[in-house]
From Swiss-Prot:
Catalyzes the phosphorylation of ribose 1,5-bisphosphate to 5-phospho-D-ribosyl alpha-1-diphosphate (PRPP). It is an enzyme of class 2 (transferase). The keyword ATP-binding applies. HAMAP family: PhnN. It comes from Salmonella arizonae (strain ATCC BAA-731 / CDC346-86 / RSK2980). This is Ribose 1,5-bisphosphate phosphokinase PhnN.
Amino acid sequence: MGKLIWLMGPSGSGKDSLLAELRQQEHEQLLIAHRYITRAANAGNENHIALSQQEFFIRAKQNLLALSWYANGFYYGLGIEIDLWLHAGFDVVVNGSRAHLSQAQARYGTSLLPVCLTVSPDILRQRLQTRGRENDAEIAARLERAAHYPPFNCHTVNNDGSLLQSVERLLILMGRKEEHYASL
């Protein structure tokens, strides 16, 4: 059975960039799952599958979603296909939710690897301002929310530096790459 890597972090921490970089690299037995979201396909940077609320509810009713939740005005889901991939021995990386980690832990137990992507408040503010999706009040609210969801019961990857460093750290946590220490 593979591992489900539940990648969490505040909006603007770089989850989508990290997942996009991981998709560009070749890793055997590693898949990045798309989320099903009731948000337009061109909204934001996330590579997701856009569904209407009706489509989402039909999939949920037919047990086609392994996990689902509601946040920020949208419904989010992970397709049941991730269970097939895990049972086939693939490690699966998903863009998870900090608030719904317990739901993932209940379903996947020891197969779950919770990873929190962290970023310093100043860099987070700068990234949110640069992407231009939120106004000042919304940015303040996102910063406040980020402060109330510190990493807990999870491995951390600091994303203040380069994206490639963050990807390397994630691969080390997943056991897909050895950590090399510089000799002193």
